[in-house]
């Protein structure tokens, strides 16, 4: 190596610059802005801490019931927390959590994930299209 006296300090400066944000956050001991969610009225299907950790598993279970086992519109979900029975559908969630932007997106953006659920499914804040193409096809295939 011809320019050791320049290369080694440059590598050290790069490493220090790269790791400074990590060291700063480790020393400060803060997480930054943690989102605060609007508490909906009533009870959720399960308790708040369980839902924060496992809501995706619950939604996947409901999806499996609807798609693979033919429970159209979802089946019946028996809550372990309240003992009540709920309709296993995202519409059950939307009855309390009426804004995807104010509820779902805040936490998902905070942890840096982008679920693909909403590429196909509608949310309460999105207007459903009125034209599905079926009317057009029924003219030709009646």
UniProtKB/Swiss-Prot annotation:
PROSITE patterns: MULTIHEME_CYTC. GO terms for cellular component: plasma membrane. Heme 2 binds at residues 104, 107-108. The keyword Signal does not apply. The keyword Endoplasmic reticulum does not apply. It is found in: Cell membrane. Heme 3 binds at residues 117, 120-121. It is a single-pass membrane protein. Binds 3 heme groups per subunit. Residues 28-142 are extracellular. Heme 1 binds at residues 93, 96-97. Residues 1-6 are cytoplasmic. Keywords: Cell membrane, Electron transport, Heme, Iron, Membrane, Metal-binding, Oxidoreductase, Transmembrane, Transmembrane helix, Transport. SUPFAM superfamilies: Multiheme cytochromes. GO terms for molecular function: metal ion binding; oxidoreductase activity. The chain crosses the membrane at residues 7-27. Has menaquinol-oxidizing activity. HmeA, HmeB and HmeE subunits may together catalyze electron transfer from menaquinol to cytochrome c. Consists of five subunits: an integral membrane subunit, a cytochrome b-like subunit, a cytochrome c subunit and two iron-sulfur subunits. This is Hdr-like menaquinol oxidoreductase cytochrome c subunit. It comes from Archaeoglobus fulgidus (strain ATCC 49558 / DSM 4304 / JCM 9628 / NBRC 100126 / VC-16). The gene is hmeE.
